[in-house]
C-alpha cells in the first residue's frame, strides 16, 4: 500500500508554521477580523487541516500570544544575570525585529484573551520588564527607572506597528540605540513647560450623529470595536438600535468617523505647534510636545484609532491611512532636517519609535494627566529620536 503523498510532504514543524502564519494574520487584521481560512492559506493548507492542530480560532490566538512572550523570555534567559543594558535590550530587540510581523498580537489584540490567559501572559511579560528594569536602574541610577524601562521597550516594540521596509540589521541597530537613549534620559531633567500647547477642543456634540460618535468612542476603547453592540451605543444616547441607521449605515462607519476625527484633531494640533518655530530641532520638540499632549488629552480616541484601524474595510481605511501618512511625513521631514545623517527610512522608524515610547510610557503612568507626566513622556520621546 502506497504512502499518502500529502503526509509524505507534510513538514514536521507544521504546527509551528501555522502559529507563525496566524501571528501575522492576527497582527495585520485583528483577532475578530482574522479567519481560519486566511490563516490556512498562509500555510498552504485547508481550514479543515488547521482544525487538526487547533480546536478553534481562540486556541490558536492564545498560542500566538504565548509564543511571542516565550521568545522574549528565552532570549533574556540566555543573557547572563548582571549583563549590561545593551546586552539585555539587544536580546529583546533582535527577537522583536525578527518577528515584527506578528508583534501586534500582544500590543493591541491581547485584550481579547480570557482572564486566565491574560494573567499567564502578564506573568511572562512581567519577567521581561523586570529584567529590563533591573538593567536600566543598574546602568543609569536615575529616578523613574520603571517608566524609562517601559518607554525603552515601547521604542523597540514600535517596529511591529508599521510596515517601513528596512534591513533587519539596520533596524536592530537603530532601535537598540533609540532604546538606550530612552533608558539614559532623566524624565525630570527636561521641562517642556516653556512651550504652550494649543490642542483643538474635541467637538461638542450638537447633532444626533455627533452624539452617537461621542458615545461610541469610550465604548470602543473599553471593550474593543468587535465587542460593542449597536444596542449599547444606542442605549448610551437614548435611542432604539434601529435609529442608529438614520445617521450611520453601520457600526463600522462610526469607527471610521472616530478614526478620521482622531486624525483631524492631531493634524490641527500639529499645524498650531509648528507655527513660529525657529528651526528643525524646535520643530521636532514641538511635534513631540503636541503628540504627547494629544495622547493624554484624547486617550480613548487615540487608542481606538491606533488599535482598530486595521479592522476597517479598504474603502473606509484608505482616507485614515492617508491622513496618518501625512502626519508621519511632517515628522520625518523635520527629523531629517534636525539629523541630516538619517535617510528617510531611518527617520520613519525613529518617528514610530517615538510614538511607541509615548504609548508605553503613558500606559505605565496609567494615562494620569498632569504637566509633570506630560513633560516626562515628552523628554523620553525626544530622547528616542536622538535630539
Which role does the model predict for each range below?
Residues 77-102, 272-299:
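Hydrophobic alpha-helical connector segments
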Residues 115-140, 146-147, 174, 315-339, ...:
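Amphipathic alpha-helical packing segments from all-alpha helical-bundle domains
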Residues 14-22, 39, 64-68, 72, ...:
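Generic hydrophobic, amphipathic alpha-helix propensity
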Residues 17, 21, 25-59, 223-253, ...:
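Helix-turn-helix
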Residues 198-266, 355, 359-362:
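Conserved small-residue-rich
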Residues 68, 89-115, 136-191:
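Hydrophobic, ordered structural segments
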Residues 93-119, 153, 295-315, 355-356, ...:
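Amphipathic alpha-helical segments used for helix-helix packing
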Residues 1-2, 126-141, 162-226, 367-387:
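C-terminal peripheral helix-coil segments that are non-catalytic and often amphipathic
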Amino acid at each position: 500500500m502506497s504512502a499518502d503523498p500529502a503526509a509524505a510532504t507534510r513538514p514536521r514543524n507544521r504546527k509551528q508554521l501555522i502559529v507563525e502564519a496566524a501571528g501575522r494574520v492576527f497582527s495585520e487584521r485583528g483577532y475578530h477580523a482574522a479567519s481560519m481560512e486566511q490563516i490556512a492559506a498562509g500555510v498552504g493548507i485547508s481550514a479543515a487541516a488547521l482544525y487538526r492542530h487547533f480546536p478553534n480560532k481562540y486556541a490558536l490566538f492564545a498560542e500566538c500570544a504565548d509564543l511571542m512572550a516565550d521568545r522574549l523570555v528565552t532570549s533574556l534567559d540566555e543573557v547572563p544575570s548582571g549583563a549590561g543594558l545593551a546586552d539585555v535590550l539587544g536580546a529583546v530587540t533582535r527577537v522583536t525585529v525578527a518577528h515584527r510581523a506578528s508583534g501586534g498580537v500582544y500590543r493591541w489584540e491581547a485584550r481579547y484573551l480570557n482572564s486566565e490567559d491574560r494573567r499567564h501572559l502578564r506573568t511572562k511579560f512581567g519577567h521581561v520588564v523586570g529584567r529590563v528594569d533591573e538593567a536600566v536602574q543598574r546602568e543609569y541610577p536615575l529616578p523613574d527607572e520603571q517608566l524609562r524601562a517601559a518607554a525603552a521597550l515601547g521604542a523597540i516594540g514600535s517596529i511591529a506597528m508599521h510596515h517601513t521596509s528596512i534591513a533587519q540589521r539596520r533596524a536592530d541597530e537603530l532601535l537598540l540605540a533609540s532604546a538606550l537613549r530612552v533608558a539614559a534620559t532623566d524624565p525630570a531633567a527636561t521641562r517642556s513647560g516653556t512651550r504652550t500647547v494649543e490642542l483643538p477642543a474635541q467637538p461638542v456634540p450638537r447633532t444626533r450623529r455627533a452624539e452617537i460618535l461621542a458615545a461610541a468612542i469610550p465604548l470602543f476603547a473599553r471593550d474593543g470595536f468587535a465587542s460593542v453592540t449597536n444596542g449599547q451605543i444606542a442605549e448610551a444616547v437614548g435611542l432604539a438600535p434601529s435609529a442608529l441607521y438614520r445617521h450611520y449605515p453601520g457600526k463600522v462607519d462610526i469607527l471610521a468617523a472616530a478614526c478620521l476625527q482622531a486624525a483631524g484633531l492631531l493634524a490641527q494640533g500639529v499645524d498650531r505647534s509648528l507655527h513660529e518655530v525657529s528651526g528643525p530641532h524646535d520643530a521636532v520638540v514641538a511635534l513631540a510636545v503636541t503628540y504627547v499632549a494629544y495622547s493624554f488629552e484624547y486617550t480613548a480616541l487615540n487608542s481606538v484609532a491606533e488599535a482598530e484601524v486595521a479592522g476597517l474595510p479598504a474603502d473606509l481605511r484608505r482616507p485614515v491611512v492617508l491622513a496618518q501618512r501625512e502626519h508621519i511625513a511632517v515628522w520625518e521631514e523635520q527629523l531629517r532636517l534636525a539629523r541630516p545623517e538619517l535617510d528617510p527610512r531611518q527617520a520613519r522608524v525613529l518617528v514610530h519609535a517615538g510614538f511607541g515610547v509615548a504609548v508605553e510610557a503613558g500606559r505605565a503612568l496609567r494615562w494620569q494627566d498632569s504637566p509633570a507626566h506630560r513633560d516626562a513622556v515628552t523628554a523620553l520621546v525626544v530622547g528616542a529620536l536622538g535630539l
